[in-house]
C-alpha cells in the first residue's frame, strides 16, 4: 500500500522518493487515516515543529480548537457530498493505466534506439520513464479528472520522435480514444483518453545516454543542463509539484484545503489558466502559502485565512513559497520583479527556474477574482459564527445574469478531430481578444466564462456539424454627463482577433470545414443551454385587483409596470459568420400618443462574412445610407418575455442616465429623476437604497455608405399636463441593403446575404477603408425630465451609445 492507501505500481514514478502515488477514496469511511480530520493535529506540522517554511515567519502557530475540528469535519462531509473523492476501484484503474503507458514508452524508446543504429543490447538498456505531476501528483484529483504525465527520454530521442513515432503507436492503441497532438503549444502536449481516463502527456529530453531505472525524482538541477527550453518547461511541472509538497508543513491539511479552494474556484467561474484566471498550480501555490503562514491550523481555518489574506493582498506584490534562486548569464530566465513589472498577479513557482504561473491574468479577470476573495472572506466569517454553511461558499456564480451584454463565439467543425483542434486553438487565443477589448475606450471589463458549451441549436439545418460556444460578459463605462460621447468602437479588438484565427486556419489541410461566428447579444438573448450554469434569475410578480376588488392571479410584471421602467426593443445580434444564411425579418412598430402618432419600420440586417484559408485582395468597401433613429412617445405595452431583471451587485459601472418611470392610469409610463445604470460584476448584495436600474437595448443595423451620414436621435418626449414626462420607446428605421447596387433610401425592408463572390464583384462607390465590412450596433436609451423640475423645459438628451464592430474579410 502506498502512503495514501492505494496499491503501488511498478515502473511508475511520481517525482518523489517519499510519496509514489496520490489516491483518495470516495466515501468518508474509506478515507485513509492521514486525511481524517480527527488525525490532522497528529500529522506533519505539529505545534513543536521548529522548521520555518516560506520567506517569512508564520503569522500564527496556534493549534486547532474544538470548533476548528468541528468545522473541518463539516467541510469534509460537504466535499464528499460533491463527489470529490474517487473510489478505490477508480484509483486502481488509474494505476493500471499508468503502468500500461509506462510500458508503451519503454518499448517506444527501444524501437527508436534501434532505428538510430544502437545495438540490440544497448537499445534494451535505453529506457523512457513516466512521471506524474499536477493534481494527481498533489493528491487532490477526483473522479473523472485527468492525469498530467511527463515522459523523460535520453538525449538521442528527439521531440520529433515523440510526436511522430510515439504518436503513431498511441493513436492505434485499442484502449486510446480522442487522440490529439498540440505541437505548437507553449508546452507541446499529446492529449488522449486511455480507457476512459483523460491523460495529458508531455516530453522532456535529458542530457543522458540512458534514463536510470532508479531515477525517482527530478529535483536535481543538473537535469536542466544542456537541454532545450521546451524540455525545461516540461520538467518544470514535476519539479514544482515536488517543491510544493516539500514546502507545506502539513500535507493532509493542505490537500483538504486545496480540494475546497479548487471546487470553489470552479463553481465561481474563475478556474482557467488559459483564459486569464488561475489554474491548478496557481491555486495550489496560493493555498500552500497560507499553510506556511498558519502551519498548525485545521483545514477550515486555512480556508478562512486564505480569503482573509488575499482579500487585502496588495497586488502585484508576488506570492513566494521560497526565495527566488537567481540563474547565471547562460542559464534559463528567472522571474524578475523589475523586468516583469507588467504582470498583474504574480504567483511564482518555487522550483528553479522560478516563473510566474499567472502571466495570462488580465485587468478584468483580476478584478473578478478580487471581488470573489471579498465574497469568500465574508462567507467564511459567517461560517465561523454559524450564520452560513460551506455550501453557501460553494454556490454557483451568476455569470449569465450578471452582465447586460455578452459576446458569443461559436466554433464550427465537421468532425471530432477538427473540433478538438479548432476549439482548442480559439480558446487559447481568447485572451488576446480580452486584452484588446480592455484597451478599447469606454470598455471597463471583458470577462470570459471559463468553459465551452456544446451548442446543438444548429442541428436542424446541419446535423453533422459540431459547434462549441464560448461567452464573455461586457461592462461599459459611459459618462453620465448629458451630451457626452457614448460611442464604442470594437474594430481593432475584433479584427486583430479574427486575424490571428485566420492565420492558423490557413495552415490546416481542410480549412473549409472549420468556421467561427461571433455574436454580440443581450442577456435575454442568451441560449437556453447556459441556464443551468448558475442561479436562476428571479422573476418579479405582482398582484392586480379585479373590478370586484378581489386580487387576480399572480403573473409576471410587465416592463411598463416596473418602477425602473426598463424599456426594451428586441433586436437581432450582430454576427460574423462563415457559410451561414441569414433570415429576413421585417418587424413594424407603431407607437401612439395623446399628441401624435408615429409609424416606424425596423430593418435588421445580418452580414455573413466567409473566413477562408486564403486572403482576398480585391474586396471593395461597402457604402452606407443614412440610418434614422426616431424616438416617438409610446403607450404600447411590452410582453412579459422582456421582463428581465438584473442580479444584485456591489460593483457599479456608471453608464447613461436611464429613467425611473411609473405607469399612469392609461398604461403609459411617466419618468422620475434619472439614475445611473448598474452593470453587475459580482454576486454581492445590492445597495438597499438603489431601487432603479436600466437595460441598455441593442440595435443592429448595416450601414451602406462610408460618407459622413449619421443616425439621428429625435427626442419626441411629450409633457403631460401635470408637468411630468411621458416615457417614449425607441424605434429603429434602417434602409435596405444591396451590396451590388447604389445605396438609396427605401420604405421597404429587405435582408441581403453577403457572400464572398458578391464582395469580390461589388462596385467601388467610395474609397476603400481597410477593405472591411462595417456593422454598427446602437445601444439606445432615453433622457427624461425630472418629475421635480419646476419648468417644462427638458434637458438635452445624452448622446446614444453606439458600439461599432468592423469585421475583416
Curated annotation (Swiss-Prot):
ATP binds at residues 133-135, 146-148, 200, 262, 271, 280-281. Binds 2 magnesium ions. Also active with manganese. InterPro entries: NT_sf, NuclTrfase_I-like_C, PolA_pol_cen_dom, PolA_pol_NTPase, PolA_pol_RNA-bd_dom. It is an enzyme of class 2 (transferase). Mg(2+) 1 binds at residues 146, 148. One of its GO terms (biological process) is mRNA processing. Residues 12-25, 572-655, 666-706, 736-760, 785-794 have a biased composition (Low complexity). It comes from the Eukaryota. Its cofactor is Mg(2+); Mn(2+). One of its GO terms (molecular function) is metal ion binding. Residues 530-540 have a biased composition (Basic and acidic residues). Its EC number is 2.7.7.19. Mg(2+) 2 binds at residues 146, 148, 200. SUPFAM superfamilies: Nucleotidyltransferase, PAP/Archaeal CCA-adding enzyme, C-terminal domain, PAP/OAS1 substrate-binding domain. One of its GO terms (cellular component) is mRNA cleavage and polyadenylation specificity factor complex. Keywords: ATP-binding, Magnesium, Manganese, Metal-binding, mRNA processing, Nucleotide-binding, Nucleus, RNA-binding, Transferase. It is found in: Nucleus. Residues 1-50, 529-760, 785-809 are annotated as: Disordered. Belongs to the poly(A) polymerase family. This is Poly(A) polymerase. It comes from Dictyostelium discoideum (Social amoeba).
